[in-house]
């Protein structure tokens, strides 16, 4: 499928796009200042939720509305109230059945209130919606019920849907039903939930709770509830230095120890966008200046993690295991593209509260993602209701150029993640430390994510012949297409069919682990602190002191992210588990029956349509196999359908119980066979200066680069460090820049010596003290405790 581009718009389409675009700009204050502010806010919420400025008879809206009507009719036909359920097979215990029931009633409500569904204003449909609401209110979702099971269903999932239904059907419910809905929310989301910023009331969860309370304030005409919801957002805004929330380096953490920008981060971004827009211009407008941090996060925290419409699974936590959910009537795959597109749609919502300059930049990025996502085209993505489609189409049709994916390196040190973007490829790295968990499981999800933080390196070649056409969306079909640059490597049934002991880039003990090893909710964390790196914004040195989950394995792993390659070093690989230890050079999903050729050369291997690897030492082992699995294997809430995918695995075997084993290899995503062979034959391109348990360092003369990760005080080539540090030196003509960080995060001052003649100091961060120049450069760095990069630039002599 080719990239989806807007066709030449008709005059009517232009007018509709203009109307929708207007809804993304400043919200008219007059509307909120109407004689009845609660009605004004309710109507504004419906505009946000149900959409405005679109033609229901035009595509893609007509089809989407017709589908909504068809689902509503199916739900009506199968609704069968009993004391323990509203639909057969979905009991109220566990309480996910309650949220499920409200979800179906919301679909029926959409069909009733929206034009073009074939059920608009149908009195029989309304009667059944009211019957369902009354049944839930009478049997389970009321102040007389004591919560059981998963708290989220009671305090976020169900009240959010109940408030939306109540807002949409307000004129048809009568005072008693509205009062009952408000009383239920008051019971399950009491004011105390929005008090202390702790427990389950932080980050994205806090925003969700505020959303329900704000709507309860609107529908119950309760100004104190609106004020409470607004004020309870303020703790979400500031940057945090530990626990849940946004960090100054763009990291987003939820559940205290889990990198979660892609799912919980999206929920927070979307929820804040809706609440900012809802309350703008009213007496409850969000005026806290910390709101700007949220707006800044679009470009600092979220956009760097999005590649061609997907958000990297390294920040999706346990959601990587969902795929097709049993409870999803739409049967849409919860993939990296699904989650990424949800973030893109959230940006469109948040644009309503952004400045003109911010809105212009965001729109350019969104246009680019719309053009480049060929896996599940965004403008017809099946998960979106018409409201999101209208906002996205308005952006696509508006003037302005689409922005390309920017090159650069983003080190998210607070969540042990790194993203590297180059013209030829994009890569993401996941690590773990005493701050960030190996993985998260919980609620029956992701029980085998054990090694996803063991140095997993995921990458996409930009423009490489892909030979694969796996789709997410409703079919999930896969095959060969030869299309270049498809970004479905981790979308096309990757997680249910991958060998969980052979995740790409990881070093692991092959000791078998039980499901949920280490505990749930981010409990398993290694007792290591040296995880992080340094970057000049273009290249980077990143390292991980690895301790295996449920294992005696220890290793030091380093990655040097360069122009067209990632140099990977491992050292000190030691284990006493009595089983082999492996480093997985890569594990590529070839799709269903993939026939891409793997060609071996002297110290290299090339995979057609993907790229290649240079392995100068050790024996590179390879395996091509078909693997079969279902999403239900890794998620109890997911579908049981089984699919087979073909895999190409490359690994290094360190043997049983290795002591101080090591490795060196280079990944060249998207490289041609000829380019790979030339690089492998060039003995002068790369020199490994050190690779042991004390330091790992490389130099690449053609790039003017020398980089080192010091695990302790020591020297490597021309560099010396007095403590654990990450150092990157870039020479450009007659100048050089040194970038230094302290990944152990002790905060103690350290000294760096670069044994190279230097002249003047052109610039230096306040944290960098120049101790000497001349024959060599001698620095003292006061690093702080967040693994920040500290720079100085000097002239060469």
Please identify what each model-predicted range represents.
Residues 76-323:
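Aromatic-lined, polymer-binding surfaces characteristic
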Residues 664, 777-797:
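C-terminal beta-strand-rich structural cap/linker in extracellular carbohydrate-active enzymes
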Residues 37-71:
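N-terminal mature-domain "stem" immediately C-terminal to a signal peptide or N-terminal signal-anchor/transmembrane
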Residues 22-26:
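Hydrophobic h-region of N-terminal signal peptides that target proteins for export
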Residues 13, 28-44:
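C-terminal segment of N-terminal export signals and the immediately downstream linker at the start
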Residues 1-9, 20:
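N-terminal secretory signal peptides
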Residues 275-737, 741-749, 753-760:
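Extended polysaccharide-engagement surfaces of secreted carbohydrate-active enzymes
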Residues 766-770:
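Small-residue (G/S/T/A) turn/hinge positions that recur once per unit in extracellular repeat modules
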């Amino acid at each position: 499928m080719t990239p989806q581009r807007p066709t030449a718009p008709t005059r009517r389409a232009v007018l509709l796009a203009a109307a929708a675009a207007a809804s993304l700009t400043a919200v008219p204050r007059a509307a909120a200042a109407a004689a009845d502010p609660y009605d004004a806010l309710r109507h504004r919420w419906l505009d946000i939720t149900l959409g405005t400025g679109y033609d229901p008879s035009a595509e893609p809206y007509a089809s989407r509305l017709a589908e909504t009507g068809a689902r509503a009719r199916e739900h009506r036909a199968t609704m069968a109230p009993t004391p323990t359920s509203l639909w057969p097979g979905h009991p109220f215990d566990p309480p996910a059945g309650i949220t499920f029931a409200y979800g179906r009633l919301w679909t029926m409500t959409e069909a009733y209130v929206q034009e073009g569904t074939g059920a608009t204003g149908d009195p029989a449909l309304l009667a059944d919606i009211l019957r369902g609401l009354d049944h839930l209110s009478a049997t389970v979702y009321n102040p007389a019920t004591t919560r059981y099971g998963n708290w989220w269903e009671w305090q976020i999932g169900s009240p959010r849907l109940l408030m939306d239904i109540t807002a949409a059907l307000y004129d048809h419910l009568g005072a008693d039903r509205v009062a009952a809905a408000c009383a239920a929310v008051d019971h399950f989301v009491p004011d105390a939930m929005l008090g202390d910023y702790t427990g389950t009331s932080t980050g994205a969860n806090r925003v969700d709770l505020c959303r329900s309370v704000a709507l309860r304030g609107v529908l119950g005409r309760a100004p104190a509830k609106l004020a409470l919801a607004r004020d309870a957002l303020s703790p979400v805004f500031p940057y945090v230095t530990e626990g849940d929330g946004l960090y100054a380096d763009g990291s987003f953490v939820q559940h205290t120890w889990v990198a979660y920008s892609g799912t919980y981060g999206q929920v927070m971004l979307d929820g804040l966008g809706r609440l900012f827009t809802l309350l703008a211009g009213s007496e409850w407008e969000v005026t806290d200046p910390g709101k700007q941090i949220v707006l800044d996060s679009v470009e600092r925290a979220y956009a760097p993690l999005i590649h061609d419409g997907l958000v990297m699974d390294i920040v999706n936590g346990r959601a990587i295991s969902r795929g097709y959910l049993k409870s999803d009537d739409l049967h849409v795959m919860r993939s990296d593209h699904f989650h990424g597109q949800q973030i893109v749609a959230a940006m469109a919502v948040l644009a309503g509260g952004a400045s003109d300059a911010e809105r212009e930049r965001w729109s350019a990025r969104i246009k680019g993602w719309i053009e480049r996502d060929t896996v599940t085209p965004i403008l017809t993505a099946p998960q979106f209701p018409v409201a999101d489609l209208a906002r996205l189409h308005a952006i696509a049709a508006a003037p302005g150029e689409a922005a390309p994916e920017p090159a650069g390196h983003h080190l998210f040190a607070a969540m042990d993640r790194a993203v590297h973007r180059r013209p030829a490829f994009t890569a993401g790295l996941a690590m773990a430390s005493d701050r960030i968990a190996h993985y998260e499981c919980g609620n029956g999800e992701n029980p085998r994510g054990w090694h996803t933080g063991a140095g997993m390196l995921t990458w996409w070649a930009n423009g490489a012949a892909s030979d694969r056409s796996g789709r997410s969306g409703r079919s999930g079909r896969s095959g060969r297409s030869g299309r270049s640059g498809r970004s479905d490597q981790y979308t096309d049934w990757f997680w249910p069919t991958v060998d969980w002991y052979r995740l790409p880039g990881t070093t692991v003990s092959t000791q078998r682990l039980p499901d949920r090893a280490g505990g749930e909710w981010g409990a398993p964390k290694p007792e290591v602190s040296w995880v992080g790196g340094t970057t000049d914004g273009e290249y980077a040195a990143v390292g991980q002191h690895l301790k295996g989950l449920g294992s005696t394995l220890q290793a030091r792993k380093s990655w040097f992210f360069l122009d067209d390659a990632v140099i990977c070093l491992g050292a000190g690989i030691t284990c006493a588990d009595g089983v082999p230890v492996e480093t997985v050079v890569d594990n590529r999903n070839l799709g269903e029956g993939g026939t891409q050729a793997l060609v071996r050369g002297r110290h290299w291997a090339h995979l057609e349509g993907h790229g290649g690897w240079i392995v100068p030492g050790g024996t590179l082992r390879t395996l091509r196999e078909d693997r079969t699995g279902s999403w239900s294997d890794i998620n109890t809430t997911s579908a049981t359908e089984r699919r087979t995918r073909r895999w190409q695995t490359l690994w290094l075997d360190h043997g049983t119980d290795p002591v101080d084993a090591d490795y060196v290899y280079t990944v060249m995503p998207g490289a041609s066979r000829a380019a790979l062979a030339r690089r492998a034959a060039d003995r002068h391109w790369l020199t490994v200066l050190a690779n042991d348990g004390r330091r790992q360092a490389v130099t690449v003369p053609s790039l003017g680069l020398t980089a080192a990760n010091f695990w302790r005080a020591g020297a490597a080539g021309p560099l010396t460090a007095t403590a654990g540090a990450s150092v990157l030196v870039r020479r450009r003509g007659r100048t050089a820049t040194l970038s230094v960080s302290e990944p152990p995060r002790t905060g103690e001052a350290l000294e760096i010596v670069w044994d190279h003649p230097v002249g003047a100091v052109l610039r230096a961060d306040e944290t960098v003290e120049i101790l000497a120049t001349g024959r060599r450069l001698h620095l003292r760095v006061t690093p702080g405790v967040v693994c920040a990069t500290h720079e100085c630039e000097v002239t060469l002599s």
